[in-house]
């Protein structure tokens, strides 16, 4: 009987967890740009990890043209380099790199985190704006 109640409670908690994520996604995700969206400027983002992708997505949604530079051959930053059994040590509601990210568990593993990075990347059209295997050694401002 108690085991059954815990199972029901667990289901309710997971449902609420997914509802909260959906709420965050719908109300806080910036809209992806349209093809006709005016561009205000061009910004270089260094690194295609969680912070770089999140920053680039927000910049794109606010009208900036973006180029992402990363010295690695793929996105993911630290999460790409850790082993596949690594997972979050905190609840994923507190580890939201972008409102669009949607996790199926409280403590997602590396592959789910990388999948969410790819989702943000493609949703905002950033997959066409990345220069992989490119090390940034100098920065100059262009007018």
Language-model region placement:
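Extreme N-terminal leader/targeting segments of oxidoreductases
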Residues: 1-42
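Eukaryotic beta-rich interaction modules
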Residues: 25-28, 58, 115, 130-132
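Intrinsically disordered, low-complexity regulatory regions enriched in Ser/Pro/Gly/Thr
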Residues: 36-39, 58-62, 88-89, 130, ...
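N-terminal Rossmann-like FAD-binding beta1-loop-alpha1 element of flavoenzymes
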Residues: 41-69
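Amphipathic alpha-helical interaction motifs in eukaryotic regulatory proteins
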Residues: 51, 56-60, 98, 118, ...
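Glycine-rich active-site loop/strand segments that organize a redox cofactor
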Residues: 71-119
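Feature captures the FAD/FMN-dependent oxidoreductase FAD-binding
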Residues: 107-143
């Amino acid at each position: 009987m108690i085991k059954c109640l815990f199972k029901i409670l667990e289901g309710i908690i997971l449902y609420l967890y997914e509802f909260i994520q959906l709420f965050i996604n719908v109300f806080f995700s910036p809209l992806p740009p349209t093809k006709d969206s005016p561009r205000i400027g061009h910004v270089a983002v260094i690194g295609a990890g969680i912070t770089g992708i999140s920053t680039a997505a927000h910049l794109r949604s606010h009208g900036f043209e973006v180029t992402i530079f990363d010295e690695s051959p793929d996105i993911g930053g630290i999460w790409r380099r850790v082993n596949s059994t690594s997972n979050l040590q905190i609840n994923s509601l507190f580890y939201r790199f972008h409102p669009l990210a949607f996790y199926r568990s409280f403590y997602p593993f590396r592959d789910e985190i990388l999948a969410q990075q790819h989702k943000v990347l493609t949703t905002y059209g950033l997959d066409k704006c990345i220069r992989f295997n490119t090390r940034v050694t100098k920065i100059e401002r262009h007018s």
